[in-house]
Amino acid sequence: MVTTQKIAGAIVGAAMLAFGQGALAQQAYPAKSVQVIVPWTPGQATDAAARTAADKLSAAMGQSFIVENKAGAGGTIGASYVARAKADGYTLLAGSTGSITTGPLLNGAPYSAKDFAPVSLIATVPYVLVTRSDFPAQSAQELVETLVKNPDKYTFASSGVGSIGHLTAELFTNRLGIKATHIPYNGSAKALTDVMSGEVTFMFDSPTSIASHVQSGKVRAYAVSSKNRSQTLPDVPTIAETT
């Protein structure tokens, strides 16, 4: 099962490919503000991690690390922007598994993982299975039973083709032997809105994105994909606990 999304925020840059030890030895880095591109909409897990990292880096390095969102096409628009950027260390990508690796494979993006140089991993993010709050199934087991009984009836949302939420849902439905229809969005905010309204049946999203909606009773969270429970949603069981 795809359990987590790895985030290399403020961390991966085409810029770093040509920014070797010689250049670093000749000048202090950073000598000016650094642009950090997040290839997703504001409020998602990658965005939150990137902003936290940018704040820490700004304080530690004496220059501003400025986060800018360039969302769309499963994260490949922002990643393409960084891949084309000048290789001087001042344009970084708050990358994730979806934007760096699966995006080029599924979306035909004009770059590959080899076009980026990893600097550090800053977070791993589990995904939570959610539906609208009044969906009839009261537990993960009941949800599975409902989906299996009507294998062609339901839909699932994601933040874009090739995103980890998309791939997690595909694996989930594949293992259940059902053919739920994928509805991709430009970011998870609109996707989650349509899940809450019942226009789309379910989705896998990060705890950061859904926590306030779970707590306010707008969505029902069934299970988290990680080995251990999420600190953000400690009352939501793991998938292993529900099977």
What spans do the regions from the language model cover?
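Beta->alpha turn/N-cap motifs
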Residues: 94-99, 103-104, 188, 205-210, ...
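N-terminal signal peptide c-region/cleavage motif recognized by signal peptidases
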Residues: 20-22
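Extracytoplasmic "Venus flytrap"
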Residues: 36-51, 72-73, 157-164
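Short helix-initiation/N-cap motifs at beta->coil->alpha
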Residues: 70-78, 124-125, 160, 182-193, ...
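Hinge/capping helix and adjacent helix->loop/strand transition within the periplasmic-binding protein
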Residues: 57, 84-90, 104-190, 239-241
